[in-house]
């Protein structure tokens, strides 16, 4: 029996592309160095002199603001329920009546590509502008704030990182999105998500058995 491995669209880098940076002989890996390499390699948010747009590779130090106590975050439109959600709702109510948590009358996340794309577009139009300064913020009364909440869709393949990056960069450059918000979002996808995947491939077993 023969087998064939295909490249995964769920990540920007394939395993062999990661191997150059994540050499097993290295003792430490630095996310910022990896991220800068990725920006240069893919010519993302850099000028003709191969320098970062905005003058810095990362605006992370400017993106740690506390969410103002009286600020009202942008409203979020959740996906409409469908037959699949109704079936899951009824099944959970019947078989897990004493479960922790609370069922709500609508899905929290998209469950198909079309609704996932709408979710991405909603983030870009309503929450992207102030994503940067509040990307690390939390609030006791609100769940989403200016976050994209795209991880579930990326992890199950409803959206690909290439699609998310291409769409968000194009939107950001054409709609006056502040550079700290645009760069901060790119860093989450191209920097942290890809870096952690590389760490898993290079040192996953070691990290799990420390």
Model features per residue range: what roles?
Residues 61-210:
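Catalytic cores of enzymes that engage adenine nucleotides and/or redox cofactors via long glycine-rich
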Residues 1-109:
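Beta-rich, aromatic/charged-enriched effector core domains that present basic-aromatic interfaces
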């Amino acid at each position: 029996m023969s087998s064939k491995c295909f490249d995964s669209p769920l990540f920007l880098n394939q395993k062999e592309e990661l191997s150059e940076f994540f050499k097993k002989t290295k003792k430490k890996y630095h996310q910022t160095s990896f991220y800068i390499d990725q920006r240069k390699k893919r010519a993302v948010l850099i000028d003709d002199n191969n320098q970062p747009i905005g003058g810095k590779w990362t605006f992370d130090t400017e993106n740690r603001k506390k969410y103002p106590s009286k600020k009202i975050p942008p409203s979020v439109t959740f996906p409409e329920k469908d037959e699949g959600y109704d079936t899951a709702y009824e099944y959970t109510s019947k078989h897990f009546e004493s479960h922790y948590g609370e069922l709500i009358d609508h899905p929290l996340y998209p469950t198909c590509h079309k609704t996932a794309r709408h979710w991405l577009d909603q983030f870009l139009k309503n929450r992207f502008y102030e994503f940067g300064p509040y990307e690390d913020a939390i609030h006791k009364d609100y769940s989403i704030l200016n976050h994209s909440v795209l991880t579930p869709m990326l992890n199950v393949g409803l959206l690909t990182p290439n699609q998310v990056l291409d769409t968000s960069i194009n939107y950001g450059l054409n709609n006056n999105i502040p550079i700290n918000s645009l760069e901060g979002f790119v860093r989450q996808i191209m920097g942290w998500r890809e870096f952690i995947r590389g760490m898993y491939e290079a040192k996953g077993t070691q990290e799990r058995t420390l």
